[in-house]
């Protein structure tokens, strides 16, 4: 029994020591990590992940600059190369007419699919003679909405208003 307890305590000590060493190593790595930005790839690099495999045109940036850039990009903002090869945040360009048509076509398809999903159980209730007056009215509103969606010109969109309620 005593040997088992000693073995358990020894294992626990080894685990705690390994955990402490990992934390110290991680903290050292974080403090020693350098960040770089490459204009030729429009990408970021760190010594932790890329070692010395960093493009020749890369410029060193601070961790806070890297965090600001990463957190600032999004739907309307993007990272690009500025003066002296340093990264900057700029407004994303407006989509081309072709890209906008593609986006609108995808939206149109998604809205039609949503309408179809709402219509199906309402239509079942009507077909089976089980629909309430509200369900019948809702079915007609959603069917009209779906027809209007099918008629939307993806190059010049005016989206119809979605019906209230979707049982």
UniProtKB/Swiss-Prot annotation:
Coiled coil: none
Superkingdom of source: Viruses
GO biological process: virus tail fiber assembly
InterPro entries the record matches: Phage_T4_Gp38_tail_assem (IPR003458), TFA_Chaperone (IPR051220)
Pfam families in alphabetical order: Caudo_TAP (PF02413)
Keyword field: Chaperone, Viral release from host cell, Viral tail assembly, Viral tail fiber assembly
Role according to the record: Chaperone involved in tail fiber assembly.
Similarity comment: family membership: Belongs to the tfa family.
Record's protein name: Probable tail fiber assembly protein
Gene: 22
